[in-house]
Design a protein with these regions (language model features):
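Short, basic/aromatic-enriched C-terminal tail that caps enzymatic domains
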Residues: 1-3, 246-264
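Local cysteine-cluster metal-coordination motifs and their immediate loop/turn environment
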Residues: 122, 196, 219-254
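FNR/FR-type flavoprotein reductase catalytic core
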Residues: 77-220
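Ferredoxin-reductase
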Residues: 2-87
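Structural signal for conserved beta-strand scaffold positions within catalytic alpha/beta enzyme cores
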Residues: 11, 60, 163-165, 215, ...
Length: 264
């Protein structure tokens, strides 16, 4: 069972309307040896009425400072409680949780990163990790509602960055795949995180291009450790233990090979 750790807030600030950045530091001697891009943690609101952690993807990991950065949308009372914290406050955290992107499968390739909305933050850690791999070219296409964007400067340090906005106020008008087509982007592998309609389109596109795709699925989670079965997704293969075609996003995922999951 993953343990709960009391983390210290070292930085917290707004990035865009309704978007908050929070950096948390581990207590001495409690940091993990490794954090993979695409993993997440469960952050507990400082409110006794809200017992369940909020699953939030890891935006950045600083192994020297032992700090995790999270960027999240303020979507309800729980995330509003987290966003109200100040530097020096403490936040209880469950994790690190889940399976992330396998850098070894991507190293040495031309890799396309696609992030939509709150699927943008985990792409920063992935871009940073891939930029260290020899012979790896990283192209990041991030999608937003409008020109009130976030993390573009950060991601641009590690990748060739393109953006798409729904209203056309910045970059390509439309979605991330519209930007891919408009700019003639070709890749040898694609990694994506975002809303389900986007992931379905990415899977179809990757199949047409005959390139591997790795998808980070977004789903509501309760426990975060696979016990409640509240975040299952349909899989292509039957699970040898449960004998059903399901996988738990919080434990087997959130990152899956596109061929592993049936998302329509």
């Amino acid at each position: 069972m993953k343990k709960k750790t009391t983390m210290t807030v070292t930085d917290i600030r707004p990035l865009a309307e309704g978007i908050c950045s929070m950096t948390l530091r581990y207590p001495e001697g409690e940091a993990p040896e490794e954090v993979k891009p695409g993993q997440f943690a469960g952050l507990y609101p400082n409110d006794a009425d809200k017992l369940l952690p909020r699953p939030i993807s890891i935006c950045r990991w600083d192994p020297e400072k032992k700090e995790l950065r999270f960027v999240f949308r303020i979507a309800g009372a729980g995330t509003a409680s987290l966003a109200a914290q100040k530097a020096g406050d403490t936040v209880d955290m469950l994790g690190v949780l889940g399976n992330g992107y396998e850098i070894g499968l991507l190293a040495g390739k031309k890799v396309l990163l696609l992030g939509g909305g709150i699927g943008v933050p985990p792409m920063l850690e992935l871009a940073a990790a891939l930029s260290k791999e020899p012979g790896t070219e990283v192209i990041a296409v991030m999608g937003y509602r409008d020109s009130d964007m976030f993390l573009t400067d950060d991601i641009g340090k590690y990748a060739r960055l393109l953006v798409a906005t729904e209203d056309g106020s910045a970059g390509t008008k439309g979605n991330v795949l519209d930007a891919v087509r408009e700019n003639g982007v070709k890749a040898q592998a694609v990694c994506a995180c975002g809303p389900m309609p986007m992931l379905r389109a990415v899977k179809r596109s990757a199949m047409e291009e005959e390139i591997p795709a790795y998808l980070s699925l977004e789903e509501r989670m309760a426990c975060g450790v696979g016990a409640c079965l509240g975040c299952v997704t349909k899989t292509a293969k039957v699970d040898g233990h449960s004998h059903v075609r399901n996988a738990r996003i919080c434990t087997e995922g959130p990152v899956f090979g596109a061929e592993e999951v049936e998302i329509g």
